[in-house]
Each structure stands twice: as structure tokens, then as C-alpha cells.
Amino acid sequence: MLSQFKQDGKKAVLGELFDFEKDVYPVGRLDADSEGLLILTNDKSLNDKLLKPSNKHARTYLAQVEGQCSIEAAAQLEKGVTISLDGTLYNTLPAKCEVVFGEPVLPERYPPIRYRKYLPTSWVRLTLIEGKNRQVRKMTAAVGFPTLRLVRESIENLKVYGMKPGDVISISGNELYKKLNIK
């Protein structure tokens, strides 16, 4: 599903999930290969308040990576790594990184990731305060562990726990601002 409302090709779009009002739009984006939390709002000021890196709002992702992610790679991710953005080298801001032991409880992905019998996978939890295009995927690849599956599990204290793909919940503006630590 694409994080847009109008049909563009063969992929499903948000407008097919629910009859949203005309002035509702997504805050940020999820690419077509990513899953998880997406905030939809009619608050035009929220995008800047939430996504501007100087405001330091944490976004946490679970990434299933190819191979067994090492403690050394996690330490590199925490310090920040160099990635390419539109052909220009960019040093990411430091991030929180945790190697997740075991399989996180997540809904099945459709379509499933490619499976290779002799290639192990592992999970890392990355918390960023910036959101460059395909940043998590580029960061994990930069330390030798390409991302196979990517799930945004939270933005600040707003979490997807207990939700299924396609679930839509409605919360008040005050409650949203409180969960997002926006004053």
C-alpha cells in the first residue's frame, strides 16, 4: 500500500482503506516496501513540528536484515554512517540501535520477503531523529546488512502495537500531540 490517496499504477493506496476527508494527508511517508505507523491528519502544522530534525522527535523502526547483525555494526549505526542521498555523501546523525534477539511479534508480510535457506536473517531496532529517503535501508546496507523487511513501530509514544495492517484509529489532536511530545 502506498502512503498516498490517489491511485498511481497497480499498488493499493490509502484512499481504498477508508473514506478519509478531503483535507487529510499523511505526515511523512512510508515507501512501497515498508510497513507500520503512518499518521494521517488535517493539522497542516504537524508535519513541520514532527519531522524537522531540530525538533528531535524519535522514530523507531524494526529492520529484518540479511545476515546476523554484529554488535560492531550496531555500534557503527549508533555513531552514524555515511550514506548516499541523490548522489551526495551524507553523514547520518547518531541513532539508537539494538540487536533484537528472537523473532519480534509482527503480522505476516504480504508479499513475504525472499527466503534463502542458507542465509540467516536477524532484526535490529533503530531509533532516528531524522528521516532521509530510505535512510534505514541505506544505513543497514552501509554496515554490511541489507534490510529485507522494514516496519516503523513508533513515533515518540505513538505505537502500532496491537494493530493489524490496514487498521485505522482516530485520536483527538490533544492526545496526538501528547503522544508525540509536541507542546
Regions found by a protein language model. Name each.
Residues 1-183:
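RNA pseudouridine synthases
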